[in-house]
């Protein structure tokens, strides 16, 4: 399950901006941080959720596949289940996060690894399983080789179908959302076009609009999960039925049997108390596009919070 962090130490007087925290990767052993010992929770289940910027169904892979046209992942989340305390955490990752991206040519030959926005990694692939596997590898490496146990990628066509299948999704808005003519504080049930615009829209002439969209995505995802959870209480096969409604727009390495098992497990989890996180950092303007740079110290603290348990 990957390698685990070596010791990281930070004394009381250090500022979080200093670079003298040794970078860690997953290995057997405990982590010393700010005077406490932490142990990686090996029982965590972590799944990568990708939202792919395409209205088309998942493409078939054949001899004509162009491995430069896998499609960008506009939404990137980790969904984690902690069986020790029955909590769910969702970690949002900014699409513009600058990290090592493996480039391939149209015939799927490896070209080189470059620093670029995380969202493009899915594009260097077949738009199917290979794209997902490459995105999963890149996200794992960004988070110090964090073990990821499965992936689900959803194209925009899946969003329409799933949103309608659950009867629309009710959200409360923390800020004005002009694209659906709603203001801060409103509680609305999103159907059809409104759900699409709510999730997809961002102002291209407004700096850092991707992070505002990410906040909307987090609100929607939490509300959607809650509704699915309520329906699953009444019908344990509900998540599998949802998957089947939208399966031509979804790529996943989670089998139907595994979905059923996870659904039954989740009934014992605290769905009201889902913890929402974002990989910390800041957006700056690059030469052409916005670039999001991770704050490594805050990232470590978040990883310890979600994936580790204090042992002293």
Regions from the PLM with identified roles:
Residues 1-312:
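Non-catalytic, solvent-exposed segments at the cell envelope interface
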